[in-house]
Amino acid sequence: MRTSRTGACALAIALTMLAPLAATAAEPKVFAMSIENGALHGAKDTLRVKQGDEVELRWTSDRPMTLHLHGYDIESKLAPGKPTAMAFKATIPGRFPVEVHGAGKGPHRPVLYLEVYP
């Protein structure tokens, strides 16, 4: 009986020590940004994360538009004043533009770049 009780205590201690590590690893990298008059506010023009990171890009805009994260093929439709998020796991290393689609005439243009490092 003593061995199983000791083993159970050791297991409980080990799980208690590992719990914070599991919680920390699952926390997403969150970036909050806004696009006002066609310009990016609240972030640098390049965001850097590590491959395997959970990422959340939170957006607001003063006009309707669609944002497209190339390489991951994620699109989000933004409405004025309504927060929108792109949530994904950064599985592909490289440099990827987030482009504005449908916010006026002319070619699509990047508002920022996402760099995913191995």
Listing of model-derived features with the role each one plays in the protein:
Residues 26-54:
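N-terminal edge beta-strand
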Residues 10-20:
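Bacterial N-terminal signal peptides
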Residues 21-25:
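Sec/Tat signal peptide C-region and signal peptidase I cleavage site
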Residues 45-63, 85-91, 96:
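Beta-strand cores of secreted/periplasmic/IMS beta-sandwich domains, seen most often
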Residues 60-80, 109-114:
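Histidine- and aromatic-enriched segments that form or immediately flank copper-ligand environments
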Residues 28-29, 78-118:
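Extracellular/periplasmic metallocenter environments
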Residues 1-4:
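N-terminal secretory signal peptides that target proteins for export/translocation
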Residues 37-47, 69-72, 81-85, 98:
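N-terminal post-signal-peptidase region of extra-cytosolic proteins
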